[in-house]
């Protein structure tokens, strides 16, 4: 898995091998990572036992000998950032297509990005908490050449009007982003927080990965568009029925008073 912003595959031309294998429908497919061993082992066990063909797309990052201990860190960060989402597809799970595709092994599968709380303390001793989304841009910070893709913003230029957390920025319609800039929180060796701006290429990679993750979510039912639409329709119908009953009771009550 590569997040090189200069790679054409980063901009919507990536071959999603796991999803391509799912398109065959009559095969067991697992997209797994060495960082999530329980999911990986379960996938191997199921795939080996099934009579169907099996396909395993496993993330095992290549690291140098001196950084071998970072293999699990990089693999885990790739999963967390939705750069390499986990899933399994098993035709034997049921006749309904939705029952065959599972994404529950992913961190916070119902969310766009995993959200974590970071406790911070200001220079005057005030304590607070930051809600941080983990995106592909956060994953890319682990790269040796990360400095090529970010710009550190001096604190005196921090503006709440023009600087938005990347996750919030990506939710905006493109027409509303002309006067906004996305940023990430990072921390230096002195444990001082910084805001850094990802370049446009990396920002668009995040947008593409969010779109790919939404596709996987929809397949897995963790954030299904049609399910949400049906729930909203049922809620609206229930509210309408409640309003109707209240109106009938008010009319009845008024008639009794008269």
Kindly label every feature range from the protein language model.
Residues 62-258:
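Flexible, low-complexity linker and terminal segments
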Residues 37-65, 74, 78:
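ATP/pyrophosphate-binding catalytic subdomain of soluble kinases
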Residues 2-50:
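Conserved thiamine diphosphate
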